[in-house]
């Protein structure tokens, strides 16, 4: 759609959010509100997208990145004024699609249908409408005897007959640029707010008997705008149900969709089972046949085919195929588990790579560590990687065995096939095939226990 430009109005403050953050940057399902709108526009085939920014302009620009065109509305003087600011950036585009940055539930198919109807009917203006059971608060669509749009009546100006109309204006429009830009120059701020309203452009088109059409959204939930925290939560719940339903239809089992939170950016393969209380966030990718949860959070992670992750928090980590992780494991950024790795209960791993088939079953901290293949890490093993100023690496080569309750003081290397005796504190490299013991020798004092017991009894 090279001849079409989308303009997203995102300059408002959103006072009802009671937030220092611009309204359009509040997040649901892994994206801020305006990102959901931009994603829908892009998936509808519109490549050129202009974002009108105002309140928190630099914050919005930084959040969205350089791929969009930005225009600044320094004073927020209404939707008509905001769109007029985008005229130069729109260039020679023949059709202008206008959307609000706080409508995150719009579907790409709805926008594509709106554009198609606009072109097929050769309209000057096409309005996306919705039919609501309770239209209170919205402008009503007035149609003539031929079904053409004759105007928009705001709630405060509507008579009883007009208030009974259930078709409402969503604030999303297609305009032919040849009519739009001249009409914007004619707008006057003849209202209590002293603002320039985009709805007045529709009125100008109707007065000149230009073809003004309306296309109803199939699902009224799509047009929900977010103006406060309650509406933010409502939109998040709707989007969560939509995401979960799409995944289930694609072959993912979600035991309890109401307690499963999956961002719009997450990808999950078929035959994966997701248990209650699971959060999948960011750019997480789950391959087929996995089992996740309950009580699991994965953010920006990759999980290989057939892995099982239970009661675990993993951040910016890679879990290879056939792994078992948890319960109560913590994988911090930079963790990589190769195939068939076992990470058990109360294990924390940070910035480390664990080789194929290795086991870290319980009560262990591995930081800045490289573990080879077929290694067993005993319970209570700690890599002492931080000296108060710098973090140092630990290397445990293939086939090594680390006994329980061992401390590996970095920088240190345990060679292939080496064995570290339980309770050791290792401060020097262990050669391949060697056994290292670094603990005090046990001393048994005969009869000492009886004497100690008698003294305790005397003290009573």
From Swiss-Prot:
Q: Where in the cell is it found?
A: Cytoplasm
Q: Which Cys residues form disulphide pairs? A: none
The catalytic site is made up of 362 (proton acceptor)
Q: Answer whether the UniProt record assigns the keyword 4Fe-4S to this protein.
A: no
Q: Name one GO cellular component term.
A: membrane
Q: Name one GO biological process term.
A: regulation of cell shape
Q: Per the record, which residues fall in region N-acetyltransferase? A: 251-460
Q: Give me the segments passing through the membrane.
A: none
Q: Cofactor note from UniProt?
A: Binds 1 Mg(2+) ion per subunit.
Q: What would be an example GO MF term here?
A: magnesium ion binding
- Keyword DNA repair assigned to the entry: answer is no
**What EC number is given for this enzyme?**
2.7.7.23, 2.3.1.157
Residues binding acetyl-CoA are: 379, 385-386, 404, 422, 439
Residues that hold Mg(2+) according to the record: 102, 227
Binding positions for UDP-N-acetyl-alpha-D-glucosamine per the UniProt entry: 9-12, 23, 73, 78-79, 139, 154, 169, 227, 332, 350, 365, 376
Q: To which pathway does this protein belong? A: Nucleotide-sugar biosynthesis; UDP-N-acetyl-alpha-D-glucosamine biosynthesis; N-acetyl-alpha-D-glucosamine 1-phosphate from alpha-D-glucosamine 6-phosphate (route II): step 2/2; Nucleotide-sugar biosynthesis; UDP-N-acetyl-alpha-D-glucosamine biosynthesis; UDP-N-acetyl-alpha-D-glucosamine from N-acetyl-alpha-D-glucosamine 1-phosphate: step 1/1; Bacterial outer membrane biogenesis; LPS lipid A biosynthesis
Region described as Pyrophosphorylase: spans on this chain: 1-229
What's the subunit arrangement here?
A: Homotrimer.
Q: Cross-referenced PANTHER family, in alphabetical order?
A: BIFUNCTIONAL PROTEIN GLMU, NUCLEOTIDYL TRANSFERASE
Q: Which family does it belong to?
A: In the N-terminal section; belongs to the N-acetylglucosamine-1-phosphate uridyltransferase family.
Q: What does this protein do?
A: Catalyzes the last two sequential reactions in the de novo biosynthetic pathway for UDP-N-acetylglucosamine (UDP-GlcNAc). The C-terminal domain catalyzes the transfer of acetyl group from acetyl coenzyme A to glucosamine-1-phosphate (GlcN-1-P) to produce N-acetylglucosamine-1-phosphate (GlcNAc-1-P), which is converted into UDP-GlcNAc by the transfer of uridine 5-monophosphate (from uridine 5-triphosphate), a reaction catalyzed by the N-terminal domain.
Identify this protein by name: Bifunctional protein GlmU
Question: What is the originating organism of this protein?
Answer: Moorella thermoacetica (strain ATCC 39073 / JCM 9320)
> What gene is this protein translated from?
glmU
């Amino acid at each position: 759609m090279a001849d079409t430009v989308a303009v997203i109005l995102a300059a408002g403050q959103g006072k009802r959010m009671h937030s220092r953050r611009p309204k359009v940057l509040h997040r649901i399902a892994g994206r801020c509100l305006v990102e959901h709108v931009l994603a829908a526009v892009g998936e509808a085939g519109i490549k050129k997208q202009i974002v009108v920014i105002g309140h928190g302009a630099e914050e919005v620009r930084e959040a969205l990145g350089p791929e969009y065109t930005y225009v600044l509305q320094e004073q927020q003087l209404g939707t008509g004024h905001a769109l007029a600011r985008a005229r130069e950036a729109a260039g020679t585009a023949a059709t202008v699609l206008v959307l609000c940055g706080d409508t995150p539930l719009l579907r790409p198919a709805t926008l594509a249908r709106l554009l198609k109807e606009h072109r097929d009917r050769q309209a000057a203006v096409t309005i996306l409408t919705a039919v609501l059971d309770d239209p209170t608060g919205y402008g009503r669509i007035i149609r003539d005897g031929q079904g053409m749009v004759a105007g928009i009546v705001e709630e405060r100006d509507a008579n009883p007959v007009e208030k009974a109309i259930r078709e409402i204006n969503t604030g999303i429009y297609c305009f032919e640029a040849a009519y739009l830009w001249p009409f914007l120059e004619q707008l006057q701020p003849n209202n209590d707010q002293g603002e320039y309203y985009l709805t007045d452009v529709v009125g100008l088109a109707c007065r000149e008997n230009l073809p003004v059409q309306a296309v109803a959204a199939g699902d009224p939930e799509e047009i929900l705008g977010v103006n406060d925290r309650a509406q933010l939560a409502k939109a998040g719940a709707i989007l969560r149900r939509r995401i979960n339903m799409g995944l289930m239809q694609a072959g993912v089992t979600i035991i309890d969709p109401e307690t499963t939170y999956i961002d719009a950016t997450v990808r999950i393969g078929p035959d994966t089972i997701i248990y209650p209380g699971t959060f999948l966030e960011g750019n997480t990718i789950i391959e087929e046949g996995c089992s996740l949860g309950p009580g699991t959070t994965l953010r920006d992670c990759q999980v290989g085919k057939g892995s099982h992750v239970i009661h675990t928090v993993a951040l910016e980590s890679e879990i290879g195929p056939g792994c078992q992780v948890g319960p109560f494991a913590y994988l911090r950024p930079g963790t990589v588990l190769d195939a068939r790795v076992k990470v058990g209960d109360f294990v924390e791993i940070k910035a480390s790579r664990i080789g194929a088939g290795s086991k870290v079953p319980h009560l262990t901290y591995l930081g800045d560590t490289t573990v080879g293949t077929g290694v067993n890490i005993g319970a209570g093993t700690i890599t002492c990687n931080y000296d108060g100023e710098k973090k140092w690496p630990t290397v445990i080569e293939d086939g090594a065995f680390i006994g329980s309750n061992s401390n590996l003081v970095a920088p240190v290397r345990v060679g292939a096939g080496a064995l570290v005796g339980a309770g050791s504190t290792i401060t020097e490299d262990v050669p391949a095939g060697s056994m290292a013991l670094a603990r005090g020798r046990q001393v048994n004092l005969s009869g000492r226990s009886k004497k100690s017991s008698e003294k305790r009894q005397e003290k009573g």
